[in-house]
Amino acid sequence: MEHGDRHITVVDEQGNEQLCEILFTFESDDFGKSYVFYYPVSAEAEDEDGETEVHVSAFIPGDENEEGELLPIETEEEWDMIEEVWNTFCAEQEEGEE
């Protein structure tokens, strides 16, 4: 994972690079990890309804000029916490649109 200001380059298991935009990051004291919500920048990332799939990973930030590392979400408890954070984010976005 490479960091830009608001972009990261994600490399999949096949070695393909994909530019993604960071939606937001947060830290969890309960799990002692940082997390990032991100989505692909390319138009091909949209589904047939025009929706863009958002991904989430734990991450270890890199030092100033070093790459960081994306990590998988490991437990059901982490997924529950992430879902709660996502739902709060979506509710706040909807309130801002009104």
From Swiss-Prot:
InterPro entries in alphabetical order: UPF0473
Pfam families linked to this entry: DUF1292
Classification via PANTHER family: UPF0473 PROTEIN CBO2561/CLC_2432 (PTHR40066), UPF0473 PROTEIN CBO2561_CLC_2432 (PTHR40066:SF1)
Family indicated by similarity: Belongs to the UPF0473 family.
Descriptive protein name: UPF0473 protein GTNG_2486
Organism expressing this protein natively: Geobacillus thermodenitrificans (strain NG80-2)
